[in-house]
From Swiss-Prot:
The lineage of its organism: Eukaryota, Viridiplantae, Streptophyta, Embryophyta, Tracheophyta. One of its GO terms (biological process) is translation. Its main location: nucleus. The gene is RPL11. GO terms for molecular function: rRNA binding; structural constituent of ribosome. It comes from Oryza sativa subsp. indica (Rice). Gene3D superfamilies: 3.30.1440.10. Coiled coil: none annotated. This is Large ribosomal subunit protein uL5.
Length: 182
């Protein structure tokens, strides 16, 4: 009995809640619509536009002007997109890419690295990947009736997220100093 491997608690397993792909163009117009087409082609969903919060004259941005687009992907499609994004980054992330709440994010320079064929009329766009991790039971904080808080022991921490990334994707986590030398 003692020699048997202890079963892990299925409630403690970490999973991807959602993946958010964001392209921030910084201006409205034709470049933004082409960026939204890239996201739609990549995810199969129609993207949502983000508006500027306030006017910045030096950037030429007015308040409530559409300046970025993003799409939220869940389930198996999110896992596939995350895998392709991490492949571009060669499964290497910085320690500062992970937040205290167990989320992490990274960016890529060119969307054509994900396997999309280059189209001269569209151009090349970089994008950000944001991954939100959770454990089973996080619904208690989101549900409408009898809303409650997730306990401190059950929350995903920065260390939990980094360990999950290293185990699941055999990823490498670099410090800032290591990233500059390579």
């Amino acid at each position: 009995m003692a020699s048997e491997k202890k079963q892990s608690n299925p409630m403690r397993e970490i999973k991807v809640q959602k993946l958010v792909l964001n392209i921030s163009v910084g201006e409205s117009g034709d470049r933004l619509t082409r960026a939204s087409k890239v996201l739609e082609q990549l995810s199969g969903q129609s993207p949502v536009f983000s508006k500027a919060r306030y006017t910045v004259r030096s950037f030429g941005i007015r308040r409530n002007e559409k300046i970025a687009c993003y799409v939220t992907v869940r389930g198996e499609k999110a896992m596939q997109l995350l895998e392709s994004g991490l492949k571009v980054k060669e499964y290497e992330l910085l320690r500062r890419n992970f937040s205290e709440t167990g989320c992490f994010g990274f960016g890529i320079q060119e969307h054509i690295d994900l396997g999309i064929k280059y189209d001269p009329s569209t151009g090349i766009y970089g994008m950000d990947f944001y991954v939100v991790l959770e454990r089973a039971g996080y619904r208690v904080a989101r549900r409408r009736r009898c809303k409650s808080r997730v306990g401190i022991q059950h929350r995903v921490t920065k260390e939990d997220a980094m360990k999950w990334f290293q185990v699941k994707y055999e990823g490498v986590i670099l410090n800032k100093a290591q990233a500059n030398t390579s």
